[in-house]
């Protein structure tokens, strides 16, 4: 999969969600918009914020469009004007979360070891948002099912983040910052799998799991520089 690199926003956007609706990304990444477009983007972001709160508190299945609509002073029809279905709204919430992670990583998106450091920072941040972590864990597992409405979203997401992570290891190798003999593709797959697995374990035992610490302990032996 090719990753767009036309400008800073493109490079940041492509990190996790290559097909994210543009208006949500403009708000999530801090890009400037004007006029009616800005008003529409702001309203959509308000809906996404409300949905994130509802879904992370009571779960996606129990969370209703009515509750989301009430939080932003709209009718259900008003919400559906911006998002055609509950599934579309969920995708926007997940994409917005990825946008926040991208901002933590840096703009423009860092390369090499700096990218890996950004993933550790993202893990630290995730420990402050248990509801959103739980939402991601549950929906990403459900999204592996054939025919699930978000299967395509997660397929694209994992392809994008895996590609960037592999490129980070490859760049580190070019700079002599990666231990010789390290398989960059395997290291990237293992790192992403570790991040996902740690989120599940952390949800079950948050007082016993240090997600960022465990990521550092995995990465440091692979590097010739301090993480």
Identify what each model region corresponds to.
Residues 95-101:
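Short, basic, alpha-helical segments at the C-terminal edge of helix-turn-helix-like DNA-binding modules
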Residues 102, 114, 129-131, 148-175, ...:
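Amphipathic alpha-helical packing segments from all-alpha helical-bundle domains
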Residues 92, 103-134, 184-191:
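Hydrophobic alpha-helical connector segments
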Residues 121-127, 135-145, 217-222:
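Helix-loop "lid/cap" segments that line or gate small-molecule binding pockets
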Residues 1-42:
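N-terminal intrinsically disordered/low-complexity leader segments
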Residues 42-46, 50-92:
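Helix-turn-helix
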Residues 135-137, 182-201, 214-221:
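Hydrophobic alpha-helical segments that form the core
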Residues 14, 23-24, 147-148, 159-187, ...:
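Hydrophobic alpha-helical bundle segments that form small-molecule/ligand-binding pockets
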């Amino acid at each position: 999969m090719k990753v767009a690199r036309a400008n800073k926003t493109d490079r940041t956007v492509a990190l996790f969600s290559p097909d994210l609706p543009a208006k949500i990304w403009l708000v999530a990444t801090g890009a400037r918009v004007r006029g009616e477009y800005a008003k529409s983007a702001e309203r959509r972001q308000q809906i996404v914020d409300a949905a994130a709160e509802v879904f992370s508190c009571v779960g996606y299945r129990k969370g209703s469009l009515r509750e989301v609509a009430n939080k932003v002073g709209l009718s259900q029809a008003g919400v559906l004007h911006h998002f055609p279905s509950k599934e579309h709204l969920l995708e926007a919430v997940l994409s917005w979360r990825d946008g926040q992670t991208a901002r933590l990583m840096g703009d423009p998106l860092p390369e090499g070891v700096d990218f890996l450091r950004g993933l550790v920072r993202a893990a630290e941040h995730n420990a402050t948002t248990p509801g959103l972590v739980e939402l991601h864990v549950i929906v990403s597992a459900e999204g592996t099912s054939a025919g699930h409405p978000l299967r395509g979203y997660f397929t694209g997401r994992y392809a994008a983040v895996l590609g960037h992570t592999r490129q980070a290891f490859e760049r580190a190798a070019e700079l002599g910052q990666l231990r010789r003999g390290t398989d960059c593709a395997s290291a990237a797959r293992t790192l992403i799998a570790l991040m996902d697995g740690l989120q599940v374990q952390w949800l079950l035992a948050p007082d016993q799991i240090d997600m960022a610490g465990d990521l550092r302990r995995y990465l440091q032996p692979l590097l010739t520089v301090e993480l």
